[in-house]
Regions:
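A membrane-periplasm/extracellular boundary helix in multi-pass inner-membrane enzymes
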Residues: 236-317, 335-339
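Hydrophobic transmembrane alpha-helices and their immediate junctions
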Residues: 237-239, 243, 381-421
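Transmembrane alpha-helices of multi-pass inner-membrane enzymes
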Residues: 19, 229-232, 412-466
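N-terminal signal-anchor transmembrane segment
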Residues: 1-57, 75-83
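Aromatic-anchored transmembrane helix interface
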Residues: 44, 69-74, 86-110, 122, ...
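Alpha-helical transmembrane segments of multi-pass inner-membrane proteins
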Residues: 121-154, 169-241, 396, 400, ...
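Long extracytoplasmic/lumenal interhelical loops at the membrane interface
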Residues: 317-382
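Interfacial loop-to-transmembrane-helix boundary motif in multi-pass membrane proteins
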Residues: 11-14, 64-72, 107-140, 198, ...
Length: 466
């Protein structure tokens, strides 16, 4: 009896700490922050929750949790061999990703399905409301030809009047990727909602979010959203419609993804052309955004007015520099690994990885802080073993996703994997989560990967004889 009471106390203590950890991080990052400074005590708070999650993970025997634990062990081992201080601020960024996973991934499995449904619904509703309000402000600013800055609050929404792009963040790709993720989270909220009013509100929020996303002209988010849309249709077809054979079911996936990319890219760039203002370049040009004071800018002054083509322009997907200078960064990382092959096994010190890669980049490439590719960054920082651990976690997630899609599940369950797949595609051209900085996408990724894993394990238990 006492042992059962102790387990129950530990379980509820973990859930309280994990929920607080999630809400705290989402609350401090609801704004589109261009700085993701992790507070010193946050790592200690996460470690406490991680210990709880490992204790419960042993009982639940979640392969995802234990594989990621192996990743943390490998990072600690390599850091110890190099003589690094694992409490240093630079290392904190790297361990934040794995700690967040160990804290949040077991949470859905500790809650009953109905309770997790309510927990997820409430969390997404608050997040969607905050982000939709910011998207609405951005749309108003762009369509009216104004620009709104609020750097003091570490977020910024504005319209660069020179190239007709809406900047939701000083780092446009990061902000656009967050907006695309919010579109998919709102779609899950739509599936979770039961009333017609709530569903209508979700649709309206998605329209506002897509409008703001279109004005960012971020091709990464456009393409990743198309991949997620194609995967969504494929999952629904597999769950609701009988396919002639498994081969046909698998072959149709890349076709649907290609169609989704074309559709999303066409719709969003078309929306950009439709609603983007055609105004003269204003005082925003050639301004250091990171030092700009908070204020409200009006239209370009009469002295600066020039005649422009009435049709707004956007970048073509087949431009010669399709990846905005990332080719030079990726080549630098590959040259580093070629010049020092031993790094393929051990990886380089995480704080030194960027500096070492910059030494091998193409001349003229500006300095960068990471490899702009999560998988390449993992390879450089933690070697082939670290990359294999990351790929193993992703493979386990995809297997669990496939198991869910084979059974008749509620719509919201079938859609849980969409934001994760979306983010994994975005990671091909940036480092938003895991071994990069602690952005809101990191916490959603960990929570939803754990939710898919928990749902698949529940299905497995239901099939076992009583």
């Amino acid at each position: 009896m006492k042992q059962e009471t102790g387990r129950r106390i530990a379980r509820w203590s973990y859930m309280a700490v994990a929920a607080g950890y999630l809400w705290w991080n989402l609350a401090r990052m609801t704004e589109f922050s261009w700085t993701f400074t992790i507070m010193p005590y946050l790592g200690d708070f996460g470690i406490i929750a991680a210990i709880f999650s490992l204790i419960l993970g042993w009982k639940k025997r979640s392969p995802l949790v234990w594989t990621m634990t192996a990743g943390l062990g490998w990072m600690l081992l390599m850091s110890a061999i190099r003589g690094e201080n694992v409490l240093a601020a630079e290392w904190q960024y790297l361990k934040e990703g794995i700690i967040a996973f160990l804290v949040l991934a077991p949470l859905p499995g500790c809650l009953a399905e109905n309770r997790f449904r309510q927990f997820l619904k409430g969390t997404i509703a608050v997040w969607t409301t905050a982000i939709t309000c910011q998207a609405a402000i951005g749309l108003w600013a762009a369509i009216s030809g104004h620009a709104v800055f609020s750097m003091k609050g570490t977020w910024y929404i504005g319209m660069n009047l020179g190239d007709h792009r809406l900047y939701l963040n000083a780092y446009v790709t990061t902000a656009a990727a967050k907006m695309g993720m919010t579109v998919l989270l709102t779609a899950i909220l739509f599936a979770l909602s039961r009333t017609k009013r709530a569903k209508i509100a979700c649709v309206m929020a998605i329209l506002v979010q897509c409008g703001a996303l279109a004005l960012t002209d971020c091709r990464t988010a456009f393409v990743a959203l198309g991949v997620a849309a194609g995967f969504c249709v494929w999952t629904l077809l597999g769950a609701k419609v009988h396919m002639p054979s498994k081969l046909n079911h698998r072959l149709i996936l890349p076709m649907l993804m290609a169609a989704g990319i074309i559709l999303c890219y066409g719709l969003l760039t078309g929306l950009l052309t439709l609603i983007a203002p055609s105004v003269a370049p204003g005082p925003l040009d050639n301004v250091n955004l990171l030092e700009f004071p908070a204020h409200l800018m009006t239209e370009a002054s009469a002295e600066q007015e020039v005649i422009l083509d009435s049709t707004p322009v956007h970048r073509n997907i087949d431009t010669t520099d399709a990846f905005n200078g990332r080719w030079g960064i990726w080549k630098g990382a590959i040259r580093l690994l070629t010049a020092q092959p031993e790094l393929l096994l051990t990886g380089t010190s995480a704080p030194l990885a960027a500096g070492m890669m910059n030494l091998y980049t193409t001349p003229g490439t500006k300095y960068f802080q990471h490899a702009h590719n999560l998988y390449l960054q993992t390879l450089v920082s933690w070697g082939i073993p670290g990359l294999l651990i990351l790929l193993a976690v992703i493979a386990m997630f995809l297997v669990q996703t496939a198991r869910i899609s084979k059974r008749n599940q509620p719509l919201w369950v079938l859609m849980l994997s969409l934001p994760v797949i979306y983010l994994l595609v975005c990671e091909l051209v940036d480092c938003f989560t895991m071994l990069s900085t602690g952005s809101p996408m990191l916490y959603w990724l960990c929570l939803l990967m754990g939710a898919v894993d928990a749902q698949a394990r529940r299905m497995k238990l239901q099939r076992l004889p009583k």
